[in-house]
Amino acid sequence: MMGSYAASFLPWIFIPVVCWLMPTVVMGLLFLYIEGEA
């Protein structure tokens, strides 16, 4: 995953990861934190 291949491949996989996966992880961590505090 180096060079021009990574440069052309990365944006297509990075956008859905940031838009969908990161919020899901953050919401999951917040849920676990809130449940742990309760």
UniProtKB/Swiss-Prot annotation:
Localization annotation: Cellular thylakoid membrane
Function: May help in the organization of the PsaL subunit.
Similarity comment text for this entry: Belongs to the PsaI family.
Gene name tied to this protein: psaI
InterPro entries membership: PSI_PsaI (IPR001302), PSI_PsaI_sf (IPR036357)
Predominant place of localization: membrane
Membrane-topology annotation of the record: Single-pass membrane protein
Keywords: Membrane, Photosynthesis, Photosystem I, Thylakoid, Transmembrane, Transmembrane helix
Keyword Thylakoid listed: yes
TM spans (from-to): 12-32
HAMAP family named among the record's database cross-references: PSI_PsaI
UniProt-recorded name of the protein: Photosystem I reaction center subunit VIII
GO BP terms in the entry: photosynthesis
CC terms in the record's Gene Ontology section: photosystem I; plasma membrane-derived thylakoid membrane
Entry-linked NCBIfam families: PRK11877.1, PS_I_psaI
Species whose genome carries this gene: Thermosynechococcus vestitus (strain NIES-2133 / IAM M-273 / BP-1)
Superkingdom as given in the UniProt entry: Bacteria
A Pfam short name: PSI_8
